[in-house]
Structure formats: structure tokens, C-alpha cells
Amino acid sequence: MAGRSWLIDSNRIATKIMSASASSDPRQVVWKSNPSRHCPKCQHVIDNSDVVDDWPGLPRGVKFDPSDPEIIWHLLAKSGLSGLSSHPFIDEFIPTVNQDDGICYTHPKNLPGVKSDGTVSHFFHKAIKAYSTGTRKRRKIHDDDFGDVRWHKTGRTKPVVLDGVQRGCKKIMVLYGGKAVKTNWVMHQYHLGIEEDEKEGDYVVSKIFYQQPQQLVVKRGDKAEQEVSEDIFAAVTPTADPVTPKLATPEPRNAVRICSDSHIASDYVTPSDYVSAHEVSLAETSEVMCMEDEVQSIQPNHERPSSGPELEHGLENGAKEMLDDKEEQEKDRDNENQGEEDPTWFDSGSQFILNSQQLVEALSLCDDLLGSQDREENTNSGSLKDKQPCIADYAHLGPEDFKRDLEECQKIVLDPSNIELDTPPEFRLSQLEFGSQDSFLAWGTGKTD
């Protein structure tokens, strides 16, 4: 069974293509030609009136939309350059305007085939000078309905490359009405050569369309291009690994002041090196977190947690930790402010006063530590010294004896420079003068020197 057939010509093909791209009903297209042929036997004229079904043309979406290099190719063929010849149907898609004023002989809405629905129309025409002298090209249009309007160039002239070589240029112009009123009519004009201005008498191609309001128009292909771009972005974007948030910027570790007496503490630390206990703990915490980040960064990829719900959960936990840390810092500042008003703080603000029993126990621990070091040194040297009286004895005597000796210390004046700490003392502890709790720690440390 033979399929359906129709008689067509170049005009009908071009008309169908233009109608397929338009928003109007293709069934209401007015044909400008009626293709026909004669029967070779009886010379009967055969046309499409004998066909039961009208020729459906081409599906909606088929359009003539050449790229910039393709337009330059058609322009070269129209001008007879580079040995090119025009396509037999090119006049149906890019008609030639032969008026004396070129494309500016009338308002763009009056040009053949031009519509205001956003479809594009192409025209061949020659470049014409506006005046007999000079090089300025004609841009002004005399219109009885809209008055004088003019095409104004916008932006810079862009080169058009064909087969790796610049063969033409492109200009973009906008139509302005009276009193510099901008319209939605846009024209892209193409000419041959590498110069910005076209030569008089040479053919140019003008692509004219009525730009639709941006809020009402969705450009064809934008949605598909956006989806493709998202797919490409997802394919090339590396998977993000969760990172433990840093609560504070790590700072160089500084020595902590352990003595309030300036003449003793100067041997160990300087006032500028002093940091509070809270700052030290915060710096140590930050260093531990940085070490964890470095360990995670050198783990193999298959051991790393993948992004997804776990990543979101990790980020939420990190944000929560940062908020908690901020609250803790505020509380620390409040505590520092309260500490300045509390008389139980030292002048240095670094230690809280201990009661007598706690102080004795702390000194006992320090003395045991120093004693163990002395025993190790004596063992290594092969000699063994007798046990010497030490501060730890007060842990067995009780706090009352310690308080009494401290009170007596305030009444006795003694020069500590003549004391030899390496020999057993010939005096009671009450004969020594202690300035503060830190003095005991510094004095105990001096045994190891």
C-alpha cells in the first residue's frame, strides 16, 4: 500500500517551517503558492486540491535558526565569495530587501514575515550610508504611525569565526522611539570582514525579533541546558567529607605561671607568657581536634564517611557544638567578672585559695614526687642518704600544727639566702617566711636545681 503524498515547493517548505516555530495554529496558514505538475500522458494539471488530507508540514519546534558562523557562510555564498554558491531554498528563509533605504525603509513590524511573538526573521540587504559624505550608515526610519525611530548600537562589535578564521563581525542594535524611548525590537546585524564597520554596498544579514518580557518568556532549551549543567556539576563535584568544626583557633602553647613572687617566677616564665587555666585547656582541646582532622585527612577514601544524611548530621552537631562553646565562653567571661569582685581570688587571678588541709595534702604530693626523684638519683649514684624532714610530715601532724607554724613565720626575720637546701635544716618550718601558696611550690621546685 502506497503512502500518502503531496506536491510541495520551496515556498511551502519554508512556510511550514516558519509556521512550526510560531505560536499560531499551523492549520490556519495561508499558502502563497500552490504546487502543481502536469500529467505526462494527458497533460492534466495535478495539484494538492486532489489530496484528501492537507499536507501536515513539519512538527512544531522545527525552525530555521542558524548560528553566527552559519549566517556568515550564507553571507559569503550570497556575495559569491570563497567559491560558495547559495542554497536553492535560501531566498525562502532569508529574503532579500531591495529597497533604496535597505532594512530601514520601514518599521520592523512591517517587514515581510516579521511577528511580535518572539520568532526570528532574517533578511539580506545592502549597507547604505546616511549621508553622501562620511561613513555613517543609515539607522533612522521614517514611519508615519510611530514617527521617526532609530536603531542604536549597544555593546561592542563581536568577531565571528568560521573554520578557525575570523570572516565577519556581529553588531547588536536596539530600536529607540521618539524622545529616546527604548522599544523591545532587537536586531543582530552581520557583515563580512574584520573591520567594525560594514562597507557601503556590501550585503549584510539582519536578524530581527521582538524581545518578549522576561517574566513571561521561558527561552527554549534553557530548562534542558540547566538540567544538563546540573548533571555535569554533580558528576565533576568531588564528594565532600565531614570536617570536625574547630571551636577555637589554636595558639602557641605558653608556659603557665606557677609562682606569684616576681623574683622567683622570673627564672621560669615572664608575665607576657602567662595564660589562664581556661585558655590552656582551650588551646589543648583545639590541638587535639586539629590532630583528629589530620588523621582523618590521611585515611583511605573507602574508610571515610560518605556524604549524605551523615554529613548533615555531622554539620548539625558541629553547629550545636559551636553554639555550646559560645555559651561556655560567655559563662567563662561572667565567671571572670565575678572573680574580680570575689576577695577569695589571688591578685594574679589564676588560683583559688585552698583550705589548710587541701594545701597540706598538695604539698605532700609535691614532696613525695621530689623525694622519689632524689631516691632515683641516689640509687644511680650508688649512695643512700638518710631521710630528711620534709613538708609531708605535716600531713600526719594535722593542719593545726601547720597553721601555728605559719603564724610564727610571720614574726621571725630570717635571711633565706644563707640557707643550704641540700643539707638537713637546723630550724623548724616556723622559722621560714612564706609569701604565698605559690612560694611553697617554687621552693619545692628549687630542690631539684
Curated annotation (Swiss-Prot):
One of its GO terms (cellular component) is nucleus. Keywords: DNA-binding, Nucleus, Phosphoprotein, Transcription, Transcription regulation. It comes from the Eukaryota. It holds the Pfam family NAM. Residues 324-348 are annotated as: Disordered. GO terms for biological process: DNA damage checkpoint signaling; regulation of meiotic nuclear division; response to gamma radiation. The NAC domain includes a DNA-binding domain and a dimerization domain. This is SUPPRESSOR OF GAMMA RESPONSE 1. Induction: Not induced by zeocin or ionizing radiation treatment. Phosphorylated in a DNA stress-independent manner. Hyperphosphorylated on SQ motifs upon double-strand breaks, H(2)O(2) or zeocin treatments. Hyperphosphorylation is required for SOG1 function, and unlike constitutive phosphorylation, is ATM dependent. Changing S430A: Loss of hyperphosphorylation. Expressed in shoot and root apical meristems, in lateral root primordia, in the vasculature of young leaves and in the root stele. The lineage of its organism: Eukaryota, Viridiplantae, Streptophyta, Embryophyta, Tracheophyta. GO terms for molecular function: DNA-binding transcription factor activity; transcription cis-regulatory region binding. Residues 58-211 form the NAC domain. Changing S356A: Loss of hyperphosphorylation. InterPro entries: NAC-dom, NAC_dom_sf, SOG1-like.
